[in-house]
Structure formats: structure tokens, C-alpha cells
């Protein structure tokens, strides 16, 4: 992967993105982002989770589309394939996932606006860097031969495996709550799929997906989002594992936090 594209604006934004990734990697060692089971309604301003997630993720679709469509190669085969993979991911993360969140009726909003703001910064950077890179092909690497390159093929396999694990794991968690009792607030231990091996298979799937994406696109923008994702999700996975073990006395002892049979 080459560092400089020769486009001053792009290279500057990429540098800023790497600096932000470093901040997330360090910050994640000391605190968890206040959403989900680690959310607090006592500090700061909070939004409805559906709205908060949607606002946080929407730049990944909108900003990506704007800058992708400005590129001269926007209708070339490889950029179109990469854009399709992108839209597959953010069709799920930015649109389907927020709409599918099951919120307890009458429960206070719990999605902290600071999480939304930080997330919007990430998805804006991410959308610009990838949308612009794909359709401008700054490094002249996206000829049709890229579709048979081992980096693309290997990365695609890893990406699809991770994406499948992510979607399946979120489906299992989403269906833990009894539809006949939507007001239930208690947490339950999920079983099946990746939960047989780790506490946070959705996080593992997300990490695998972005690792595969970085490989199949072979650009530094993909590496940035993998680092940011790791900085957020790796420590969160360990905190989640600890939370489950403390809350449920009969929690499966064979489960690891994030990587099957390892940690």
C-alpha cells in the first residue's frame, strides 16, 4: 500500500484519519463508548437508539455516494464492485440495523450524543476516503485484473465470512427478547452460532469484515477503519465478557471473549 496519492486534500484527510485511529486505539484502553449495556442516562444528552444509530451511520452512505459519483471511474467494473460491497455493508449497518433495534416501550433514551458525534466523524471520514479513492483510482490499481488478484479474492472471502457472522449474531441477539413481552428489560445469555465459542461474535464478525475489506481494496482507508473498529470493539469485547460472567453465575465457562479457543 502506498501512502501518498498525490492529491493534497485526500492525503491530508487520510493523515487526520490515522491520527483519530491512534486516539481511539489509546482511548479504548481506558473507557467504553457509552452505548448499549454501557450506556448511561445520567450523563450528557441522549437520543432514541434508533435515531442515534441512524444519524451516526448515515454519512457512510451519503458522503460515500457524493464523492464516489464525482470520480471519472465511477462506472468502471472494479469501482462498481467495490461500491456494491460498501453498500451491502452500510445497507445493513446504517439502515436495517437501526430500524431493527427493539426498544423497551417507555424506556428513557440511552444513545449518548457524544457517541453519535464521534461516530459521524468516523463515517464521514470513512465515506469520503473510500468513495473518492474507488472512483478516482488515485494509484491506478483498479483495472479489471484486480478482480482476479489474490488480495481481492482472499479479502472477499474474509469479508463475506465476517459479514455473515456479524448479521447472524445480531439476529440471535435481536430475537432474545420475547415478542409477546416487548417491555421485558432483563438481559439473557445468547446461544447458537458464534456464541458457542465467544461472547461477542458480532464484534469478531465486524473485525473480520473490515480486515477483509482492507485486503480486498488494498488501500490505507480500509486499514484506518479496521484500526478504529479494533480500538473500539476489542476492549469492549473484553468488558462485555466480564459483564456477562459477573451477571450470570452459570455463564458458559468454555466461551472466550473474542477469539475462539484463544482469548
Please give the residue ranges for each predicted region.
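Membrane-anchoring alpha-helices and their flanking helix-loop junctions
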Residues: 1-197, 204-263
